[in-house]
Amino acid sequence: MGEYITACGISRKICTQGPDGMLKETLGGQPSIRKYVAHKIAQLENSDRDMRSLFRLMFSEKENVLAESTDGYKIRSLTYGESLENVRRKTARLAALLGGVPRGSVVGLCLANSPDWIETFWAILQAGYKPLLINDRLDDGTIADACAACGVKAAVSEGRQFGVRHIRLAQLLEDADASSVTDDRFENEIFLMSSNSSQHLKICGYTGEQFYHQILDSAAILRRCRAIKKHYKGRLKLLALLPFCHIFGLAAVYIWFCFFSRTLVFLKDLAPDTIVNTVRKHRVTHIFAVPLFWETVYKSALVRIRERGHRTYEKFLRGLKLCGVPLLGRLITRFGFREVRDNLFGESVCFCISGGGAISADVLRFVNAAGYPLSNGYGMTEIGITSVELSGSARVRMRGSVGAPFASAEYRIGDGGELFVRTPPAAKGLFCDGARTEQDGWFNTHDLFAVKRGRYYIQGRKDDLLVCSNGENINPDMTEQLFRADGVQRVCLLPSPRQSGKILLVAE
């Protein structure tokens, strides 16, 4: 039986951790989410803590639904058991296509988010190779440099080639005899490319041991935060929006939740209407995205509200200001902003995370006030995901904290305001400008942070500071948020190309 649970003041009929309903069918025979998580973690702790162990446990609930997608009409589902068989077939095909390539070599993976990405990722490992997760939005030169740095021998893609042996995805989809496939050659290392924000290409190596710690952190989050484990009508479904080739998408979306055999919902394309319609059609419960996504949601909603007239817009602004008030705010969210939810994602969304950069206070306030619990999080390719705000209070989430570091992580703020992180899930090896180094100890993120009452707040990036003629440092991330006006879509601070120490304000 389901029961009504209130999150941010919105009553929703959902199946809970009780013994009845659809939810129990997805818990591997365990009577509750808490016991199911404890059972899976105990299995992981008693394993070899490598990628093979992670693979076996991730696909152990074969009847659970791994993926959903739609062609616009019918929802298509893929179970973990069906996907497991696909992995075995892809492994057999890959082993044949990589004949002559020594096992232990690096194989590039350049695909968009899809069940094929997941299956090819595991097939590369099961065949005895190490995947390099390639961001297909990068230019050919950057990707070629990454392939050279890692010694990539072959790459799987839908068409792009990078000067190494090319394997088309279509070749892996051909039928193959998987009867001889075993996992005794399973590799235990993968490589991710950084976002290259520092203008230096970095490639980070991770093993099963690092993901073991990431999963322990996710289990601790599930114990501390009620919203993150909520199911809507017996199902927990994450929107597969973030690229799996990035640490945020790989760890927080795929590894965290698919280890516990939850469901991913894949998009046909990234058009705004497609995203909104997919969330509503599939009843997506969790959306993790970068700040730009949430800013787009906010601005689109404002446009629609303004179209309703000045009076409606003024009422909306007054309600928005009151949403941080504990009791009154919940009532406004529940009743006053119901129409906002009807025009956005509907009522199924239970938990959201913004990560990958600073998010404005206006956006946080709006999304939380609308009834979608949005928390700010933090992580980097080099260190994994290390913190997220877990408060059940909308007022706390609106402040923009990334919370306290996870149990496995330590934070320290240096004299210049830069955040240093020490954590077992950090990447073990780094390729930077072609040279490999082993990472150990405190990692300098070069991100500026402040800490208040144990909660950490992103202040910007040290590399982005602008130096004025009087020697004062200006932080664009903090300053740009002060320049808000009707009719202005975005603002940007830039150093003057003509006068040293002068700063230009550009508005659109």
Model-derived features: positions:
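N-lobe entry segment of adenylate-forming
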Residues: M1-G99, R103, R160
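Flexible, low-complexity linker/hinge segments
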Residues: A42-R49, A144, I167-E189
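Conserved pre-ATP/AMP-binding loop-to-beta segment of ANL
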Residues: E63-V65, D175-M193, Q199-H200, R226-K237
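Conserved AMP-binding/adenylate-forming
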Residues: R76, R93-L138, L241
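Conserved AMP-binding A3 loop
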Residues: R76-G81, E189-L216
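Conserved AMP-binding/adenylation subdomain of ANL enzymes
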Residues: I215-K237, F244-E339
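Gly/Ser/Thr-rich phosphate-binding loop
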Residues: T285-F288, Y298-V396
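AMP-binding/adenylate-forming catalytic core of the ANL superfamily
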Residues: I413, G417, T423, H446-E508
